[in-house]
Design a protein with these regions (language model features):
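N-terminal hydrophobic membrane-entry segments
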Residues: 1-184, 188
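Single conserved hydrophobic/aromatic residue that forms the stacking wall/gate
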Residues: 197-201
Length: 201
């Protein structure tokens, strides 16, 4: 009786170990596998088997496009105006191995790199140019971030400036200017109503 119970325990234990060694990788994901602490392989979509005790899953990587919305960053323009700009970065992991071992915290690294790149770009532009050159800034940032993140197995698809917030005094002056321009345009049709067309003799 005791030997049968022992055999059942052994069988259950073996089945449990085998089951724990089978991994199913879903669509748009990858798994970085290590053997004895060193990189062994990258698994794509499908069913895989890892050796018990000597192999382990180091990281499960999402290969879909991801979006990170960073908080506003203080930047200074060429004409010494301090403003707040927040950015949205769209990126995709192209090399799971590099992503797993390239940098400790990839998202934080992208945020710091994004802030530094933004400050460098805005530092070469004056306020008026900054406010009217969103697409130029987006393109420059995407190109710079894409090159810098390539060793981390990351491709930056696009960057968008979400908000450009100038100082309160400048923002108020801009609003007054826009209001005056709007009132001027609205006044033009009214002035024409007071014109009298000449009568034909």
């Amino acid at each position: 009786m005791g030997s049968i119970l022992f055999l059942l325990i052994v069988i259950i234990l073996v089945l449990w170990i085998l089951a724990s060694c089978i991994r199913i990788v879903p669509q748009a994901y990858a798994i970085v596998l290590e053997r004895l602490g060193a990189y062994q392989a990258t698994w794509g979509t499908g069913v895989h088997f890892k050796l018990p005790f000597v192999e382990r899953v180091a990281r499960k990587v999402n290969l879909k496009e991801q979006v990170v919305d960073f908080p506003p960053q203080p930047v200074i323009t060429k004409d010494n105006v301090t403003m707040q700009i927040d950015t949205v970065v769209f990126f995709q992991i192209t090399d799971p191995k590099l992503y797993a071992y390239g940098v400790e915290n990839p998202i934080m690294a992208i945020e710091n790199l994004s802030a530094t790149t933004l400050r460098n770009i805005i530092g070469d532009m004056e306020l008026d140019e900054t406010l009217t050159s969103r697409e130029v800034i987006n393109t420059k940032m995407r190109a710079s971030l894409d090159v810098a993140t390539d060793p981390w197995g990351i491709k930056v698809n696009r960057v968008e400036l979400k908000n450009i917030i100038p100082p309160a005094a400048i923002q108020e002056a801009m609003e007054k200017q826009m209001k005056a321009e709007r009132e001027r345009r609205e006044a033009i049709p009214v002035s024409y109503t007071h014109l009298t067309l000449p009568t034909t003799p």
